[in-house]
């Protein structure tokens, strides 16, 4: 649905305000669904931090990931949009996640996607970093040892199962 919505917007078949309205409705539904899930419980739970890097605003896919993870009894901390590496470092010091997940759909203005991936790997050597999004999939990026590129929803679902 979201891909069709984006395609309609790109081809001028709908107005940006219509796409924004639909995105807000979907966001609200996802937030309610996430809140209705029980808080993960048990020993040795996997812990994820989800976030969007600086300049990223397309959060529906990350919210969907939040829902998928929490529905599988996985602890999730969603930091939100426009998160700097420094802020992410502070959050990781406090929460000590096993995994970091983000999506990179917009082109970075200040640095290359490869440079950003390398910084993530260097700054968070103890976490498994999971990346997806158009900019990561469409470009030939080199994934360091602790970085995994998720090319599809099927790959993502297999990883969280």
Model-derived features: where do they sit?
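C-terminal regulatory/effector modules of DNA-binding transcriptional regulators
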Residues: 21-22, 28-161
